Amino acid sequence: MNTPLRVGIVGCGVLANAMAGHLARQPRPVEIVGCLVRDPGRARGALPCHGSWEALLAQRPEVVVECAGQAALAQYAQVILAAGVDLVPASVGALADDALRGALLEAAAAAGARIRIPSGAMVGIDGLAAARHVGVAEVLYRGTMPPVALQRYVSGPLPERGLAFAGSAREAVARFPKNANLTGTIALAGIGFDRTRVEMLIDPDATANVHELLARGEFGDFHARVSGLRISESSPSSRIVAGSLAQAALGSGFLALS
């Protein structure tokens, strides 16, 4: 295709710029039509920035990728979808809010838009979604991260080593809004936010974010594991997350939320 894919972005931080870099290297031409930020004058990087969603949508993006956190997704997702523009959310954990998820699905259906859930930092999301049709009884996500990947983004004390959290995916995204968005993707692909179990561990010796997905049911069972290097010291996201956002923006490798 010679016609550039027009992509908008919510946010202009490390993750957004990494994702834009991947898009720039694709065989199909891609035009970043703009980033939605609070203060365009303070935005990092060379991407064009806009201070309002109206200005961003005026650039006629075909798809918008959210890279700015759960609050930004809650604020802007509905107007983007209502404009008939597909949405790729990085902050999938926000969709644990049943009312928000319902409103976004309603807006998408009315406008003919899609919510494209990226695979994020994990492999095996497609397999989990397929297994759901056969029957899934249990799903466990276990994340092991160095202290810096967690302590900077949560309030309250955390242990120096070992288990920092055990609970449901719904509880995890509330406790770790910057670190547990992957659990939202797993919950949506599988058995939901309340039945998906999550363990978050701290390992001072870890040099990467380790993600494990274990599932069991009538289909059988599987165990997937990814050791993901982080984008930078200033970002909790694994490098593969930026790649998954780029892939979903290009139209493949995503879970269509319904």
Swiss-Prot record:
One of its GO terms (biological process) is NAD biosynthetic process. Pfam families: Asp_DH_C, NAD_binding_3. Specifically catalyzes the NAD or NADP-dependent dehydrogenation of L-aspartate to iminoaspartate. This is L-aspartate dehydrogenase 1. The gene is nadX1. NCBIfam families: PRK13303.1-3, PRK13303.1-4. Pathway: Cofactor biosynthesis; NAD(+) biosynthesis; iminoaspartate from L-aspartate (dehydrogenase route): step 1/1. The iminoaspartate product is unstable in aqueous solution and can decompose to oxaloacetate and ammonia. It catalyses: L-aspartate + NADP(+) + H2O = oxaloacetate + NH4(+) + NADPH + H(+); L-aspartate + NAD(+) + H2O = oxaloacetate + NH4(+) + NADH + H(+). It comes from Bordetella bronchiseptica (strain ATCC BAA-588 / NCTC 13252 / RB50) (Alcaligenes bronchisepticus). It comes from the Bacteria. Its EC number is 1.4.1.21.
